[in-house]
Amino acid sequence: MGVSMITIVTLLDECDRLPGRSRDAASTLWIFLIKQCMEQIQDDVGVPIIVRAADLFRFAKPMLILPRQHRPIVRTKPPDGTGVRGTGLAGTRDSFIVRLFEDVAGCSTEWQDVLSGYLMLESEVSGNAPHSLWIVGAADICRIALECIPLPKRLLAIKVSGTWSGMPWAIPDNIQTLLTSTWEPKFDTPEDRAHFCDSDMVCVYKILGSPPNPLKPPEIEPPQMSSTPGRLFCCGKCCKKEDRDAIAIPVRYTATGKSRIQKKCRAGSH
């Protein structure tokens, strides 16, 4: 039945820009974001498919409760950084290189890229159930979805003060924002809530319109059986799916909050 909903799960700086690469944001931000994502998928409409950048493997432990074919990865090839240092909380980065911490081969189902994975879900290969596609990561995985997939999308983001290091990316002005609101994060302890409030972070929820001129999707070969028993190439040379798990978990999404978010971006900083 295809994809019924697309949700972009990412981070934003005070200028409403996504980090260019996973490593351009601190690990604590990714850990918190992924945890909140897993809280939000309960009872969503459709079967949840959460695709993430492979270099977020170190922070993706909560996702392992999902069946293997419901948590694919994309091995992104992000551009080199510019050497520009960020500011504030957004500019705080880890000392290690995040991209080295990727899923080992066979640990997760792999998609060639987000667009070919989306086309696979829209095809007959995906079966009769509707899918809710969640895309988690920086601009190196989210940008192609925002610019190429011809559907409205939800944006579930955590906005932090300061600016990203490297080459941050802003959502183009020609992608219309239809709604801006907030959502309420979940916390394990009162101390976690207090720390979040003290950090001046904001949980942003947006409805984004379809891109006005979506790029033509790349041609992909039809699904074919691989030489390895139990494995199917579903959307390209790197897309592998093994025997289906026996169970899946339900999904839920509840958007909360009605206040509009005001941009903090300084003039000329885009």
Swiss-Prot record:
It comes from the Viruses. InterPro entries: Herpes_US2_varicellovirus. Pfam families: US2. Belongs to the herpesviridae US2 family. This is Protein US2 homolog. The lineage of its organism: Viruses, Duplodnaviria, Heunggongvirae, Peploviricota, Herviviricetes.
